[in-house]
């Protein structure tokens, strides 16, 4: 289990979203994609600095560590009626990922859009003992099968530092 202190320290002082504008699939390119669906509600899980606020219609950002969130809460503790679309861009990478996925299943109705880390530690030295969940294409496919999701896309994406991430969209 990841110590809350380590996550809070990491996200409040170490992590920066310097990649956001440069990501091929999961940066600002998502604005047009999501808005074209005219969603009645969008949940941004682990929204960080809430960069999509005001850009994506009907968006609510949750994050347990960042004051820019609309609601300062973790996905594990968040309760709400389901949103049409969920964004999970780097937030489902540590802790009890299986429980987080189970909880997320109740929070979206149409699509969930993910960017995940395949278990590659970040290059910053100050993130304590945070272990990154080892996402793989096979794991993504198993999760889809477990919950009965379709996979609309599954792509490799690279950060500005050259680190691999996976971008995928689940559909119900």
Describe every region a protein language model picked out.
Residues 149-159:
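Conserved S-adenosyl-L-methionine
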Residues 94-104:
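A short, conserved alpha-helix within the catalytic core of class I
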Residues 109-121:
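Conserved beta-strand signature within the Rossmann-like core of class I S-adenosyl-L-methionine
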Residues 87:
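A conserved beta-strand element that flanks and buttresses the S-adenosyl-L-methionine
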Residues 122-139:
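Acceptor-substrate binding/catalytic loop of class I
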Residues 91:
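Hydrophobic adenine-recognition pocket in adenosine-nucleotide-binding enzymes
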Residues 1-43, 48-76:
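Conserved N-terminal segment of class I S-adenosyl-L-methionine
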